[in-house]
Amino acid sequence: DFPSPLVEKQSTPIALIINKSLTDFVHTETVEKGGDFVIEVGSAQRALFERLAAGLFSNHTFVDSIGEPSISALAIEPEIRELQFATPDQTRTDYYEVWMRYDFKLYDLERNLTSTWSIPAYGKANKNNHTGKRDGLEAAALSACRDVMAVFSIKFSSEQLIADWLNLDSPTTREGRG
């Protein structure tokens, strides 16, 4: 379960693009002398971004793609770019660890990609609290998802890249569009 951010809400209308590649994200990897690993985090993404949006934006919508005609706002498209992991056997600790990198593609009012905000995340889970490797790795991955949510929430209002992007929806910018 993901907590709602306790931050001041942004008033700029935002469209969040939650596409199939995000909601179906599965990391598979074969580790020499360690076996095959499958980490499913895609199914948690919609809940994560619903909570994030509810706590951070006072005016937001969800869409499936940047091509949807209903988008009339700045748009954010999250993408899991990278996932790495370590097991207790590899690190000689009691923890499963997951490192993730999310890219947040930022689109202007004309649906042009203006920039990408990249956020690294880290999560861990104690092996003693989980029944197996898959369960432990998925718990660590969900912890990393909470981490990215926290970083996004805290840094959103202070990140210069975001401030520049939000200015694309200023009244002056909207007037210039006719």
Label the predicted regions:
Residues 1-50, 158-178:
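A structural "domain/chain start" motif
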Residues 1-9, 61, 110-178:
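C-terminal/domain-edge helix-coil "capping" segments
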Residues 34-43, 90, 130-138:
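Second-shell loop/turn segments in exported
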Residues 40-66:
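Mid-chain, structured segments of secreted extracytoplasmic proteins
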Residues 44, 48, 97-101, 139, ...:
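A general alpha-helical scaffold signature found inside nucleotide-binding enzyme cores
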Residues 64-116, 125-128:
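Surface-exposed short loop/turn segments
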